[in-house]
């Protein structure tokens, strides 16, 4: 994924996206989810600033497939590393992903055999700029 102005469709200079907080700093489980929509199927992705990719967990992928979401299989398996160890996944291209008031076209995703879907910096590279406001629990995504 990389910045291409024509891939981000919507009105306005930016869209503000609410972050859904999970846990607290006191229980060492502070995390944020972001709501996305892929061809009408809504889901939550864990915002992972340490992840390069945009991943779809197996549970979400099954929901997408059963809802008839089309995708392009790139016929490439990749290996990823993270806090949970290593995992293998298949690269696909999604026609469009809705986040906030924007629709993002041509999103490369890795389908993993794990339950969690991650929104990493790879997806955020589709925008010209991203501002993470931790106090307000928002992301500002700029065209």
Locations of the language-model features?
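Pepsin/retropepsin-fold aspartyl endopeptidases
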Residues: 1-143
């Amino acid at each position: 994924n990389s910045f291409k102005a024509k891939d981000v469709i919507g009105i306005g200079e930016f869209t503000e996206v609410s972050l859904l907080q999970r846990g607290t700093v006191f229980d060492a489980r502070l995390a944020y989810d972001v709501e996305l929509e892929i061809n009408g199927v809504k889901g939550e992705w864990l915002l992972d600033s340490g992840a390069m990719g945009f991943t779809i967990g197996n549970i979400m992928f099954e929901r997408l497939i059963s809802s008839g979401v089309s995708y392009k299989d790139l016929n490439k398996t990749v290996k990823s590393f993270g806090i949970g160890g290593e995992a293998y996944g298949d690269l696909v291209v999604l026609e469009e992903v809705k986040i906030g008031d924007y629709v993002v076209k041509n999103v490369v995703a890795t389908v993993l055999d794990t339950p969690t879907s991650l929104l990493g910096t790879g997806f955020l590279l589709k925008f010209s700029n991203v501002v993470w406001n931790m106090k307000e629990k928002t992301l500002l995504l700029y065209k």
